[in-house]
Design a protein with these regions (language model features):
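SIR2/sirtuin NAD+-dependent deacylase catalytic core
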Residues: 1-173
Length: 173
């Protein structure tokens, strides 16, 4: 089932590997601006790992968006405080978010699978990525208690919490 947008907050290449049999997708990664002299917030890669033009994303059937970067194909990472200070400074006006992500979200909601929101930075990114999206939003949570901040965040974004075993739910799909 091709999804138009997958937002992956892990640094690993697992989702890239899962898409490896397809050619109709592109990956967009957040990049550190430490060595950049231009106003670049992300890079676009084709399935082979080659740099692609940012406007090529509009023709892709699926966008794999990795806002924190990834180990593959180019080892882009946002990990330093200085990386996040720049992003957080600009994220309210949506500068670090690719145009194709903004366009896709206008008519859709989000389903969050496999990530917890007990970290302020993850909540900040999620809040800004889903900004101006249509909704509804769902959060798949295994049978673990939510933190107070997670409960508050889910209420704030209007997300319905689905408590289920991820593997059992995937088997039903």
């Amino acid at each position: 089932m091709p999804l138009p947008l997958i937002v992956d907050v892990w640094y690993d290449g697992a989702m890239r590997n899962a898409l490896a049999g397809r050619t109709d997708w592109l990956e967009i990664q957040g990049i550190t601006r430490a060595l950049e002299i231009s106003d670049v917030w992300y890079r676009t890669y084709d399935p082979s790992g080659a740099v692609a033009a940012a406007d090529a994303a509009h023709a892709a059937r699926t966008i794999l968006y990795k806002p924190h970067g990834s180990v593959a194909p180019a080892q882009n990472y946002l990990v330093a405080d200085s990386d996040y200070v720049e992003v957080v400074t600009e994220i309210d006006i949506q500068t670090p978010i690719p145009d194709c992500v903004k366009l896709i979200r206008e008519s859709r909601g989000f389903v969050f699978v496999g990530c917890r929101f007990n970290d302020q930075m993850l909540r900040t990114y999620a809040r800004q990525i889903i900004k101006r999206s249509r909704g509804p939003h769902y959060v798949l949570v295994e049978n673990e208690p939510l933190t107070r901040n997670e409960e508050k965040f889910f209420d704030e974004i209007g997300a319905s919490v689905v408590r289920a075993d991820a593997q059992a739910l995937a088997a039903q799909l």
